[in-house]
Amino acid sequence: MLYHYTDFAAFDGIIKCAELRLNNILNMNDASEMRLFMNGICKAVTDKLNQAGEIEKSRKTAAFFENEMEEEFHYSAYAACFSKYRDDAAQWERYGHLGQGVCIAFHEDLMQKMIGGAIALQEVYYQAVMSEHPLVDEFYTLIKVSKRFSEHLPEFQNLMNEAWVQSAAFKHPSFTSEREFRLVVSPFISNEFAIEPKYHVSPERIKKYYPLDLNRMCGKLNLHLSDLVGEIIIGPTSSQSIPILQDYLSDCGLNMLKDKISMSECPLRKPTS
């Protein structure tokens, strides 16, 4: 199972609208980690080129990575986050509205069958040193064997796109305990990406996001949304009653989920006012 901790407003969108919202990673705390990943790959590749005496190619590579970083919004990825941990205190506190929210469990095997193209289900990896990352050798080999290195090489740009995609699933090792997975959309890798973006307008700002149609994705496997959901856990500090939530699910046409509700057993304390 993959566990998605959220608040009840987002839960309503998932259940009633069958829509999973994927938000821009650059608007999340993870933006700095994407940059950390790209800078780490760049340093590992240029160090390796310098050691091989390819000083000019190393310089050009560093300059190209620098230019790419300035265009990071073009490479924006959009994600929804999950954890392998059920009823976890840290997840409730960080992502489940301080325990007042709700957790939806999704069947991982079914989600894997539903994705493809610009949509990927990625396990987050936590790595401090990039020198051992497979992309380093791929960049190094391509640049080393090219007689005249140019950032306009299609193979080089493809590798750069792959680096941006993988950066969306990178986090600092201090977050290893989260055991996170991400459902990631990378619109920049496909000209035929069929999902139209939407915008959430708040008093403070306008945010862009991509809505995944869960009914459509389930329909590809001849499944119903209720088949995708394994259980629903009410947060440890939530005042939500099970009978009201059962009525809500019935009114949404999801009677099959009524018996999959449970209360959290996590001993998280209610926030003090």
Name what the model sees in each region:
Residues 1-273:
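Partner-binding and oligomerization surfaces adjacent to conserved cores of proteins
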